[in-house]
Amino acid sequence: MEKLYWDMYRLTVMDFGGVAHKAIAGIDTALWDIKAKALGVPLYELFGGPLRDKVRLYWSHCGTYRAWFPDHLAGNPPSLRTMEDIANLGREVVSRGFTALKTNMVVPGEPARVIWATEGNSLNIDHDILEAVERLISTFRQAVGDKVDICLDLNFNFKTEGFIRIAKAVEPYNLMWLEIDTYDPQALLQIKQSTSVPICSAETLFTSKGYKPFFELHAMDVAMVDVPWNGFTESRRIAALADIYEIPISPHNYYSHLSTLMSAHLCASVPNIRIMEIDVDSVPWKDDIITEPLDIKDGYLNIPNRPGLGADLNEKEIAKHPWHMGRKIETAPQRAR
């Protein structure tokens, strides 16, 4: 397996990252799945057996998809018209057994929207955005109580100064982490050193070589690792490198259940796992395109012990849902109000 990975890597080394490495990642992970199934063992057994049989989950994009795709989600969840609707969503998280959530800069209204840097000077922070973010996080905190963890994902939406101002604004709410995307290790370190809020980053990085400059500076408290982008071989290598620097990892997992299974086996096979991402709000047919259901109980995913990743794709169901260019996401480039 290692030889096959490096054969593919050498063929694409002049086109590092991007679509080339994503293709390698898919092939690499599929090969691990094939080998484990051929041997009749779960994938994690190829690395000496599981370190854990379940992993704690956080409800990701909590409120985000209800703002973006209110007409396309399973169960027709309530709209987010007011801050009370945000509070009710927080209480729903608790009632469904989750002990952690992650949200974006959701602004309730008719329609609800998500603050996103899409045009002009929208990478700049202002008082309206700060007020909207603080109101959102305060409402979630009051709704879920002190024992449920909250994460806020800011993506690439600001420059360093804006990230620092938001970090300062949310310090009173005891976040599990503030999630920030950047390709500048020094800028991320500056943000980390400016706040008491733990910083999570790196979901868009490729290979251990891409992570190394960030780890050397201890520029983040938690490293996000995307298994579908990096592949199983390289994701384990990134986890091992992070462990050398005493940094826990969290799989970046907002895709399908197939990605969830990939991430689950990574969690089973490396020691330094903080928590795992999962999307709860999704399309009604998400469960149908895989042959085995996920086993989620009390906010934990029980890692499957079936051969390989633990399931296969249902090709017939997938064929029922061809991809079409969808409507433009309303991301609210205008200022929050």
Predicted regions and their residues:
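Metal- or metallocofactor-binding catalytic centers and their adjacent structured scaffolds
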Residues: M1-L39
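Shared catalytic-loop signature of beta/alpha-barrel
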Residues: K3, M14, K168, N174, ...
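N-terminal amphipathic alpha-helix/helix-capping segment at the start of soluble metabolic enzymes
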Residues: M8, V41-V55, L301
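Predominant activation on well-ordered alpha-helical scaffold segments within soluble catalytic domains
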Residues: I24, D28, W32-D33, Y44, ...
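Conserved, mostly hydrophobic/aromatic
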Residues: I27, G40, L101, D153, ...
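Proline-centered loop/turn at the N-terminus of a beta-strand
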Residues: P42, R56, D149, P198, ...
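Metal-dependent enolase-superfamily TIM-barrel catalytic cores that perform enediolate-based chemistry
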Residues: K54-I191
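Extended hydrophobic packing segments that form well-structured cores
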Residues: L309-R337
